């Protein structure tokens, strides 16, 4: 595949994409079309925390495919794997946090967290850490500290601020509405 096709037909989400053509992955490595291995510190934006092509993950996916691929993540249908996962998670949480909101991406989880924070507190302001990545939706961009990625999409969500970590003076940004 030509790099020119990549830049011509696929939207870029960062100013300087790596543009490595990946042919396959195994364990903690991704490989380019010349079979050069790279240690994968991105891990599918944390989706591959067990590594690529882990045998137990492959087996679980194949077993599930024999039943059904996907019906819905929003709690409309009883799906045994989802119920088992949420039950397992609840064993490690306080009684007041026994329910789990399942999503299909980290960005969607961030959007859910933003809504939950506003709903649970009744407050409008959101404080986030500078230099944190949360995704590419409007809500996620609003609490991301990378101005270079945010600029083209303004105006973003109102009442959001990004503060520096480990800087006590930044705590002044917290108000009664945070």
Specify the residue positions occupied by each region the protein language model found.
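Glycine-rich loop-to-alpha-helix module at the N-terminal edge of alpha/beta enzyme cores
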Residues: 7-8, 37-123
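Active-site-adjacent loop/helix segments that line or gate small-molecule/cofactor pockets in enzymes
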Residues: 1-26, 81-82, 175
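Active-site and channel-lining beta-strand-loop segments
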Residues: 19-42
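Short secondary-structure boundary/capping elements
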Residues: 22, 53, 81, 163-166
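Short beta-strand-to-turn element immediately C-terminal to the catalytic PLP-Schiff-base lysine
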Residues: 31-32, 50-52, 143
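Glycine-rich, flexible loop/turn motifs
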Residues: 16-18, 26, 46, 65-68, ...
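PLP-dependent aspartate aminotransferase-fold enzymes
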Residues: 86-178
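Intrinsically disordered, low-complexity boundary segments flanking structured domains
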Residues: 1-2, 6-9, 70, 88, ...
């Amino acid at each position: 595949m030509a790099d020119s096709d990549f830049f011509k037909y696929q939207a870029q989400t960062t100013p300087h994409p790596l543009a490595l053509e990946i042919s396959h992955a195994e364990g903690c490595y991704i490989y380019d079309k010349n079979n050069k291995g790279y240690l994968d510190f991105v891990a599918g934006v944390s989706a591959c925390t067990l590594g690529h092509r882990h045998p137990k993950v492959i087996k679980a996916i194949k077993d599930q495919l024999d039943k059904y691929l996907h019906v819905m993540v929003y709690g409309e249908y009883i799906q045994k794997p989802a119920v088992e996962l949420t039950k397992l998670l609840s064993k490690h949480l306080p009684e007041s946090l026994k329910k789990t909101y399942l999503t299909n991406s980290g960005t969607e989880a961030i959007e859910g967290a933003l809504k939950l924070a506003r709903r649970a507190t009744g407050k409008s302001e959101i404080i986030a850490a500078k230099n944190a990545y949360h995704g590419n939706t409007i809500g996620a961009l609003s609490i991301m500290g990378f101005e270079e990625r945010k600029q083209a999409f303004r105006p973003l969500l109102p009442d959001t601020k990004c503060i520096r970590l480990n800087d006590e003076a930044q705590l002044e940004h917290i108000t009664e509405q945070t």
